[in-house]
Structures are given as C-alpha cells and as structure tokens.
Design a protein with these regions (language model features):
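Metal-cofactor-binding active-site regions of metalloenzymes
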Residues: 1-531
C-alpha cells in the first residue's frame, strides 16, 4: 500500500508539468514510467533497489489494468491507463454504499490522510465513485460531502458529533482558499493580479529538489490557462457539446509548444466558457462561480449545503471518469490530457496548501500570504459578492446546520464591520436558509492585531513608533464602536489577540492598548508567544 501511495504522489505531486506537456506533443523519447520510478527513488529511500526494480512491471501489468472494463497493456498505452492508480489505491481505503457519501476506513486513515494532504481528496474519490457507479449501473447527480471525508468509526463519530468549540479559528484559513481560487482560474482564465501572489514567482517549488531540477519553461499562470482549456474541452465532450466547442486537441498541443499561443487561444476559450456559464446555477447574491454547477440538475430543489460549491469540479471529474470506464466520448484517447490537468491542479494547489517539509513561522507566513484571491475581476460588485460567499462558506462549514459547534473567529480590526454584516444564515445557492429562520450560527469574533518588527532605527522616536500609531488608530475604532460590536444579530466581538512572532516585538508594545481596552469593558486577551 505504501508503494502505490508513493507512486501516486510521484505522479500527481512531483511529476514535472513540462515533461507531461512534451509527451503530449509527441516526444517519443519520454518514458512516463521511467521518470516516475526515478522520482520515487529520489524521494523515498525506505525502498530497496529490488523493490524499485519490480515497480515498473507492477505499475504496467497490475495496478494499471482493469479486467472488468477490458483495460490492459494490450489495449492501450500506459499513459492512457495510469489514472487507474487512483482506483487501485482508493478501493482498499474507502467505503462505498449505493448513493451514500463515501467514507474512509478508520484503520486506513493515516495512509489516506498522508496522500490526500498532498494531492487533495477529490482526485482520489471521484475515479472510484465513477467505477463503482458504472458497475452498479447508477448515476449520481449530487456531490455534497465535506472537503475532508468522514471515517467509519461510529463510536468516535458519536463523540465528535457532540457540541464542540473552536477557539482559535482564522476565518481566512477556513475558506478553502485553493478550491475557490481554482474555480476562478477555471472560469475566468487569463485574468490575474500582477503582484502579491504566486503568479510572479512560484517560490514554494524551490523548496523541492525535484521541482528545482525540472525546467519549467512556462510560469504557473500559463499552465493554469492550459488547464482551463483542457477542462472546457473535456467538459464539452462529456456533456455532448463538442459541435459547439472550438477547442480541439490540436489547439491544446499548440499551446504546449508556444507561450504566445496560450493567450491567443483565450479568444476561443473565453466565449466558450461564457456559453457554458449561461446554464450555471447562480448563488443567492447573483453570481455564477462554476459552469459545471448546472442549474438544470437542480430544477426541483436547490440544496442548502455549502458544499454545493464543490459540486461542479466533482461533477466534471465524475462524468469524465464515468466516460472513461464506459469507453465513451473519446475519454480513453484523451486520458493524457486529463492527467496533464490533474498534474497542473496539484502544482497550483501546493502553492496554497502547506505541504512542503519546512518548519517554522516564516514558512507558515509564506502560505498565509496566499490567503487572498489570485485574480483581478475588475468588477467591484462581483469581488464583494465572491468575498461574502467565501466567508459564508467558512462559517457554515465550521458551525454546521444544527448549531452543535461554536466558532470563535479571528479577524483584523478593519474587517470587523464587514464580517458582522454578512448573512451567514442564508444558503450560498438558491433562496433557502442554511439554518432555521431567525437562527444564526454560533460565532463570535476576536480582533486580530498583527505584531511587527521595528523598522525605524531612529533615536528621536520610541521603539515601534509606526506600529504604536497603527494600534492606537485601530483600538480607538474598536472602542468607539464597542456598543455596536457587542449587540445586534451579527457576531459579537468578545476579545483581542496579538498574533505573530514576538521576536522583535515584545509585549510592552501592546500592554498600554490592552489596558486601555480593559478600561472600556473588554477583558478577553490573548498574546501569541513561541512562534
């Protein structure tokens, strides 16, 4: 089991994108199997040379065959079969039963978590679901489970279903930053911010020796556009809209050969996505976040679950893999394009989700800085609506629909008013309520002040003069609105927090401001140390 887990990680997480692109453009000198084995040898020294020498044969003849569907080395190349690695792994780890949501076998939970942390859960779940449903001759329409699957330990689940409190939740970190940004990249390709994000320099890949050794001749924005193109092309195929789709495999190959061609193809891609979005389900505040969330699938009722946000990507993967097992819509012939799509997705994901091996607060901050939108929509109304969706998602997925869980969310002082004004009771899609009417999630707020190193070396000013001025301004804003923040239907402000490393910013900087707040009725204070 560990060997197949390492193989999948090597394929999706470590495999150089440009080599996969070169393979698709008919570079016969590239051996996917050979490269994959070389990656595993370099990453995991726990396997012997004998283990590794047998791996190539096992991949080709055992893991990447499926007799039930006539998929074997005699019928297709390894590249068109290698996605079977996911079903081979997941069938030993997941429980499937009819149309119920999948669960993880408790005794396999560590192996599942170790791999899904690197590549995400949906990539491992949807292929197995598609295979299972094809064999059972059923087709599911809704994919509304949490981003982290539940396990099958009923006694432990019963304990976890009791009332719980999260007293240190960073609300930005609870928004599934990567998932939301990926939806925007796939539905608004080519539109990006020019600074402050991984688009300028994918720095986190430099921590990884395999990534550093690979010649990534395109920056990540280009690969994201290619992924959006592949997704639109495959979506048109599985939904039988190929006649209206101007994107062809030849066009994708041209994009892989020339960077200029990538953005030229946006002239065909953006109108196609706009056509797909005509049938997309709108959120309650009137935006369409994913063309694969088809409104025609929810004519009778729109689920109030916040996980409907993920339905589109899951629906796309499910329909494509179902076509793969049914041998329809040219899915098997385009399996290498799906593999390219998944590799690009994992490369972008590793820029948002902390999966590298570094430790310490600086590494944490590198990822924390990515908890923002990567795209510039140029539309303030759209941006505001999207922000409300992400915050509503964070609160609803944390608190649950039965108010069993209590959330103490940390927000910056400047965001308190906007966070309090948001309607967390209303469902993200449709007109229904996520909670019962006149009910609100159990959420309270902590004002989150950020420590800073003293940058002004001047004998005529006190230490941290600029930070003290900022703290004074922010604290006065809070004190002047303390009555507003402590009443009404929105989340109440109940305390203050000084976050970040105390190195270079001792408690003396915050002490007078905390005393000032205490005089005005705030008595709940926390101060981060040891980071």
């Amino acid at each position: 089991m560990d060997l197949i887990r390492n193989t999948i990680e090597g394929l999706l997480y470590d495999f150089p994108i440009e080599l996969m692109g070169n393979y698709i453009t008919k570079d016969d000198s590239i051996d996917i199997n050979e490269i994959l084995i070389d990656i595993i040898k370099r990453k995991d020294v726990s396997f012997t040379q004998t283990d590794i020498s047998l791996l190539s044969e096992v991949i080709n003849d055992t893991w990447c065959t499926d007799a039930e569907f006539g998929i074997s080395p005699e019928t297709s190349s390894l590249t068109n079969r290698i996605l079977l690695l996911m079903t081979e792994f997941s069938k030993h780890v997941l429980n499937l039963a009819g149309l119920h949501n999948p669960t993880v076998r408790f005794n396999e939970l560590l192996r599942w978590r170790t791999l899904s942390l690197k590549v995400g859960e949906d990539i491992l779940v949807l292929p197995l679901l598609a295979r299972y449903d094809t064999l059972c001759r059923i087709k599911r329409k809704r994919f509304l489970w949490p981003m982290v699957l539940e396990h099958d330990n009923l006694r432990l689940n019963a304990i976890l279903d009791e009332e719980l409190s999260d007293t240190h939740s960073h609300i930005n970190a609870a928004t599934d930053v990567f998932e939301f940004n990926w939806l925007r990249l796939m539905n608004m390709p080519g539109r990006k911010k020019d600074k402050g994000t991984f688009w300028i320099s994918s720095a986190k890949k430099d921590y990884d020796l395999i990534s550093r050794a690979s010649n990534n001749h395109y920056p990540l924005p280009c690969w994201a556009v290619i992924a959006a193109t592949v997704r639109a092309m495959l979506w048109a195929s599985v939904t039988e809209n190929e006649d209206a789709c101007p994107i062809t495999r030849v066009m994708v190959e041209e994009m892989l050969e020339s960077e200029d061609s990538i953005y030229n193809k946006l002239e065909s891609l953006n109108p196609l996505i706009a056509t797909f979005l005509e049938n997309a389900l709108e959120t309650s505040n009137g935006i369409k976040i994913d063309y694969a969330i088809d409104a025609r699938d929810f004519i009778s009722d729109v689920p109030s679950s916040p996980y409907l946000v993920h339905h589109g990507e899951r629906n796309f993967l499910y329909q494509w893999f179902k076509s793969f097992f049914d041998n329809e819509h040219g899915a098997r012939e385009n399996a290498d394009l799906m593999l390219l799509y998944l590799i690009i997705k994992c490369k972008v994901r590793r820029e948002f989700v902390q999966t590298n091996n570094l430790r310490g607060f600086v590494n944490f901050q590198d990822y924390d800085h990515e908890k923002v939108s990567t795209l510039d929509t140029e539309e303030e109304k759209w941006e505001k609506a999207f922000r409300e969706i992400t915050y509503r998602y964070a609160v609803q997925t944390s608190c649950g629909d039965k108010k069993r869980f209590n959330l103490e969310a940390r927000v910056t002082p400047n965001n308190i008013r906007s966070v309090r004004k948001m309607n967390y009771r209303q469902a993200i899609f449709g007109d229904s309520d996520f909670l019962q009417r006149n009910d609100n999630p159990s959420i309270t707020l902590i004002a989150h002040f950020i420590k800073g190193v003293d940058k002004q070396k001047n004998e005529f000013t006190c230490r941290h003069a600029d930070l003290r001025k900022t703290l004074k301004k922010q604290m006065n804003q809070i004190i002047n609105r303390i009555g507003e923040y402590s009443m009404g239907n929105g989340p109440h402000l109940i305390g203050l927090d000084a976050a970040g490393s105390e190195l270079g910013c001792p408690p003396e900087v915050f002490a007078p401001f905390f005393r000032y707040a205490k005089l005005h009725g705030l008595t709940n204070f926390t101060y981060h140390v040891g980071e």
